[in-house]
C-alpha cells in the first residue's frame, strides 16, 4: 500500500458511514456468528479487487491476544495450589544453577530461560501432556534445551530426582555419579529425555517430522488413530536458525493438527534484543500464518483486560502496535514509573487510563505467558484445532523473578550467579519458607533446595495431576514391546551371488537389498524408504508404483506418466517418504522413523538415501542428534567418492567416511563389492531389530 492510500485509510473521511458498516458486521456476528461475518467480508474484498482496487494482503493482526476474554476456556485446576508449586519449581531451578556456579570451575547453566517459561510448562504438565499408558500412546514433548533446570526441578519435587542428582548438574564424569546433562540428551539419560533439542533449531524440525510420521503410521494402519500431540518449545531468538522455520510449510501443507509449537517470546536472545527495532511476535505471526498455521497470540495477561476494555477509541491498541520490542524490554527492566512516562505517557488518553494506578500497579501489568489462565485458554484452543498445526506466540519476561540479577536485562542469558541480596529478593517474591540465616553468605549451602515433603499438599497435587494424565514426564521407552524377525543372509542371495561380467554400483546393490526386504511379508510393512528428490538417480523409481509415495490427501491429479509401468504414484497409505529437495527434512523423517520403536512402540526400518556429499557434511548436527537419541536405521551415502568429480569441487566427496567415523554409534562402511552390502544389511538389521 502506498503512502497516499495508507493515509486515506488512517484518516477516515466519513466516520459515520464507517460506523454503519461496523454495526452491520456486529449485527451479523450477533445473529449468525463469526464464520458468516468472515464469509461476507471475504466477498466484499473479492468484489473490491475485481473492480481494480489494490488491497494488500496482511498476515498479521493487532498486537493483542487472539482469544478475547469472553471466549477463554476456564482452567479446572486449583490456581492457588498451582502457583505455589510453580514457585517451588522456580526456586529449585534457580538454586541448582547457582549452587553449580559456587563450586570450583563455575560449571555454567541457565536461569533466565526457564524463569520466563515456567508457567508455559506448568500448565502443560498439570492439564495437557499425557504420558504413554495402556489407554493412550502419549504425547511427545520437545523441551527448550535451556529450560532443562526447570524440568529437573519438577522431577525433584515428584521424587524422581534427589538433591544429590541436582548437585551433579553438568557433572557427569565422576565414577558412580548419575549426573544431569545441561540439556536434553537421551544418550545420557536414556529413560528420561526423548528428543535432543540443542543445538538450537534441532527441536522444531524434528517435531514437525515426528508429527508427520505419527500421521504416516496411522495412514498405513500400523498404529491406531489417536489424538496424541507433538509439542515443541522454542525461543523467539532460536527462530533465526534455518532449521527452526525451514520446514514449517511441510506442517501446513500436510495439515498436521497433531503439532503445537509454543514460542517463548521473551524478546531477548543471548546478546540482546531479538528484534529491538521491530516486533518479533508480529514477524513470526506473518511467517506462520503464511505457511498455513493456526496462530494464537498470547501477549497480555489478565491485568490488561480492564484497560483494553476501556480502550473504546483504540488508542491503547495503536500504542501497543507502535511500540517496538526494545522499548517493551526497557519497560520491564526499569519499572512502573518508567513505563508510565515512556509508554502510557505518549498519548493523553493512555496516560489518563493509568492515572489512578500506582507505579507498582503498572509494573504488575503482566504478560500473557506468565498468566496461567491465559496459557490454559491458549493450550485448550490449540488441542481442539483441526486441520492445521498451531503455534502459540507467548510473550514473557526473560529472567522473570531475578530482579537486578537479570530480569529483562541484556545479560540475563549469561546470568548464572546470584548474590545473597538477589537470592533473598527471589525468595521473598515467590514466598519460599527459608529463613534468612540459611541464605546468608556466598557459599554453596547458602542457596538450599526446598522440598515441602512427599506428603505435602503440593506434592500430592502434582502426583494426582500426573496420575490422571498417565504418569510422570519426561519419560522415554528404551525398548519396544514388539519384535520383528531378522532375515538370514540367504534372503540376499540375489546380491551375494554376484552379477557375472556386468558391473553395478554398490548403490544399486543396496537398492536391490531394499527391494528384497520389500518382498518379505513380515519385514516389508516396516521398511521406510526415504528420498530427497533423487529416487530416479538411485534406481528406485520402481518403488513408486510398487509401494507408492506417501501423500496425506492422496493423488488428486493424473500423473503425466500414468500410462507407463513405473508411473509416479502417490497414495494416502504410500510407503516411500519423498521429502523434496531437503536433506534436513529427509534426515529428520529418518530420525522420526528410527525412533518409532521408542516414541510409538512401533519398530521400523528406515533407509535414508542421499548424495553422499550432501549428507554428513551438510546435516551433521542432525545426524549427531540421531546418535544421541539412539536412532535405528540405515543412512546410505550414494554416488560417493570419485563419482562426483565432474560435478565440481562442492560435490567432490572424499571426507564423508571420515565425518561418519566421529559419530560413536554410527557404524560406517565403504563397501566395494555387492556381497559386502548384503552382509552390512543383514547384520545391521540384526543389530537394530
Model-derived features: where do they sit?
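Cofactor-binding active-site loop characterized by glycine-rich and histidine/acidic residues
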Residues: 71-72, 77-89, 93-103, 110-254, ...
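Short acidic, glycine/serine/threonine-rich loops at helix termini
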Residues: 152-156, 181, 218, 222, ...
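A glycine-rich helix N-cap at a beta->alpha junction
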Residues: 160-172, 252-264, 286-293, 624-641
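N-terminal amphipathic, basic-rich helices that act as targeting or association modules
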Residues: 2-158, 162, 426, 503-520, ...
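Long, well-ordered, tryptophan-enriched scaffold segments
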Residues: 265-497
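Acidic, glycine-rich active-site loops and adjacent beta-strand->loop/helix elements
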Residues: 145-149, 231-241, 264-269, 301-304, ...
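Non-catalytic terminal/interface segments that mediate subunit docking, oligomerization
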Residues: 72-93, 114, 129-132, 139-140, ...
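Active-site phosphate/pyrophosphate-binding segments
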Residues: 488, 628-689
Amino acid at each position: 500500500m502506498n503512502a497516499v492510500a495508507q493515509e486515506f485509510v488512517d484518516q477516515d473521511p466519513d466516520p459515520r458511514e464507517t460506523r454503519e458498516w461496523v454495526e452491520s458486521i456486529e449485527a451479523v456476528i450477533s445473529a449468525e456468528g463469526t464464520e458468516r461475518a468472515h464469509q461476507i467480508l471475504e466477498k466484499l474484498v473479492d468484489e473490491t479487487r475485481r473492480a481494480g482496487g489494490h488491497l494488500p494482503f496482511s498476515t498479521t493482526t493487532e498486537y493483542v491476544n487472539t482469544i478475547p476474554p469472553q471466549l477463554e476456556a476456564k482452567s479446572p485446576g486449583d490456581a492457588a495450589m498451582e502457583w505455589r508449586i510453580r514457585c517451588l519449581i522456580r526456586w529449585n531451578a534457580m538454586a541448582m544453577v547457582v549452587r553449580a556456579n559456587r563450586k570450583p570451575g563455575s560449571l555454567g547453566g541457565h536461569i533466565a530461560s526457564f524463569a520466563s517459561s515456567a508457567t508455559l510448562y506448568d500448565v502443560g504438565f498439570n492439564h495437557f501432556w499425557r504420558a504413554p499408558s495402556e489407554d493412550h500412546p502419549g504425547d511427545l514433548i520437545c523441551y527448550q534445551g535451556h529450560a532443562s533446570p526447570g524440568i529437573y526441578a519438577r522431577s525433584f519435587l515428584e521424587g524422581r530426582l534427589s538433591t544429590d542428582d541436582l548437585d551433579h548438574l553438568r557433572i557427569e564424569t565422576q565414577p558412580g555419579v548419575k549426573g544431569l546433562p545441561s540439556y536434553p540428551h537421551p544418550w545420557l539419560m536414556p529413560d528420561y529425555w526423548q528428543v535432543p533439542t540443542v543445538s538450537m533449531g534441532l527441536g522444531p524440525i524434528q517435531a514437525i517430522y515426528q508429527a508427520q510420521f505419527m500421521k504416516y503410521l496411522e495412514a498405513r494402519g500400523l498404529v491406531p488413530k489417536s489424538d496424541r500431540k507433538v509439542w515443541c518449545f522454542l525461543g523467539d531468538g532460536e527462530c533465526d536458525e534455518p532449521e527452526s522455520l525451514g520446514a514449517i510449510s511441510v506442517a501446513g501443507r500436510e495439515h498436521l493438527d497433531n503439532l503445537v509449537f509454543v514460542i517463548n517470546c521473551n524478546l531477548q536472545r543471548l546478546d540482546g534484543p531479538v528484534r529491538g527495532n521491530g516486533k518479533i511476535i508480529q514477524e513470526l505471526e506473518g511467517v506462520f500464518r503464511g505457511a498455513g498455521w493456526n496462530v494464537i497470540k498470547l501477549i497480555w495477561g489478565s491485568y490488561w483486560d480492564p484497560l483494553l476494555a476501556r480502550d473504546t477509541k483504540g488508542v491503547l491498541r495503536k500504542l501497543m502496535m507502535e511500540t517496538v520490542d526494545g522499548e517493551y524490554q526497557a519497560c520491564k527492566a526499569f519499572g512502573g514509573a518508567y513505563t508510565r512516562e515512556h509508554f502510557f505517557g505518549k498519548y493523553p488518553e493512555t496516560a489518563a487510563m493509568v492515572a489512578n494506578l500506582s507505579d507498582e500497579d503498572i509494573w504488575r501489568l503482566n504478560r500473557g505467558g506468565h498468566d496461567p489462565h491465559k496459557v490454559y485458554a491458549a493450550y485448550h484452543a490449540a488441542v481442539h484445532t483441526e486441520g492445521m498445526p498451531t503455534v502459540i506466540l507467548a510473550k514473557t519476561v526473560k529472567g522473570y523473578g531475578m530482579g537486578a540479577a537479570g530480569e529483562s536485562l541484556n545479560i540475563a542469558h549469561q546470568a548464572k550467579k546470584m548474590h545473597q541480596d538477589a537470592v533473598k529478593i527471589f525468595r521473598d517474591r515467590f514466598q519460599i519458607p527459608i529463613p534468612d540465616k540459611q541464605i546468608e553468605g556466598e557459599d554453596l549451602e547458602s542457596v538450599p533446595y526446598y522440598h515441602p515433603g512427599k506428603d505435602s499438599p503440593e506434592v500430592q497435587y502434582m502426583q494426582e495431576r500426573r496420575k490422571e494424565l498417565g504418569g510422570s514426564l519426561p519419560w522415554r521407552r528404551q525398548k519396544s514391546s514388539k519384535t520383528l524377525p531378522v532375515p538370514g543372509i540367504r534372503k540376499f542371495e540375489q546380491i551375494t551371488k554376484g552379477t557375472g561380467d556386468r558391473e553395478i554400483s554398490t548403490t544399486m546393490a543396496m537398492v536391490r537389498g531394499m527391494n528384497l526386504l520389500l518382498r518379505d511379508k513380515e519385514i516389508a510393512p516396516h521398511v521406510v524408504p526415504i528420498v530427497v528428490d533423487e529416487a530416479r538417480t538411485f534406481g528406485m523409481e520402481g518403488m513408486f508404483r510398487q509401494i507408492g509415495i506417501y501423500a496425506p490427501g492422496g493423488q488428486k491429479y493424473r500423473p503425466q506418466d500414468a500410462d507407463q509401468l513405473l508411473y509416479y504414484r502417490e497414495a494416502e497409505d504410500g510407503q516411500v517418504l519423498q521429502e523434496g529437495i531437503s536433506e534436513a527434512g529427509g534426515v529428520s523423517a529418518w530420525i522420526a522413523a528410527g525412533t518409532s520403536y521408542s516414541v510409538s512402540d512401533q519398530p521400523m526400518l528406515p533407509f535414508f538415501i542421499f548424495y553422499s556429499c550432501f549428507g554428513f557434511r551438510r546435516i551433521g548436527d542432525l545426524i549427531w542428534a540421531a546418535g544421541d537419541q539412539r536412532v535405528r536405521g540405515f543412512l546410505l551415502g550414494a554416488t560417493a567418492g570419485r563419482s562426483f568429480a565432474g560435478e565440481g569441487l562442492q560435490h567432490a566427496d572424499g571426507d564423508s567416511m571420515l565425518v561418519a567415523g566421529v559419530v560413536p554409534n554410527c557404524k560406517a562402511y565403504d563397501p566395494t563389492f555387492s556381497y559386502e552390502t548384503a552382509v552390512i544389511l543383514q547384520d545391521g538389521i540384526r543389530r537394530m531389530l
